[in-house]
């Protein structure tokens, strides 16, 4: 999360993690998730600079996602829960980076587009509940073979990318500005590769619903903030102007986190959602 959006850094470069304050390379014992932060009281051992609470929170969230995947898939079905866990970790990375930088790393989105068909080919159960995968499979009725899962994965990527490109084109034509970033397009394409075309549409619907709620709350926050700042400066600001400020400032939210949430929900709960969707 820290490295991917920064120029000159990658997952493998530098080879070892460094203190964000003094740049000292961290030993393996200082890199144990959660435990190292607790033992060191949230500070660097070299310069004593405070290490953000965000690090252990993200590590705990990732552990929780893996636990959820194992629980829902069943410990015995390790290929399925391992694939789910990797996807969920990628979505967590995309979410945090998009919140910070309003961009989604290609390592996550394009990497997911490459990984999705390979994973579905090896673990057809990833597409096991999608009607398209069942229809395209030559196996027993209701079952999914490798070919069906692979074709459904490609269809999911096409639908995921296509629908967002269409929305972006329509938005640009209507509003005269970019309505959808390519990072979001690539992320939903990658997600569609794991959850199929129907899953991609459901994930987008969930993302739009949650994003709308958060967008309204964010605009309300800016409306209240605008009014309170005006009062603090002894100025009178009309409600109309406060509404314009709220609309302009509050509508800018990264869409990637909401897409990640939608994809994650569909990935883990497609059985229940497909019944409601159909």
Question: For each predicted feature, which ranges?
Answer:
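A membrane-topology feature that recognizes alpha-helical transmembrane segments
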Residues: 1-278
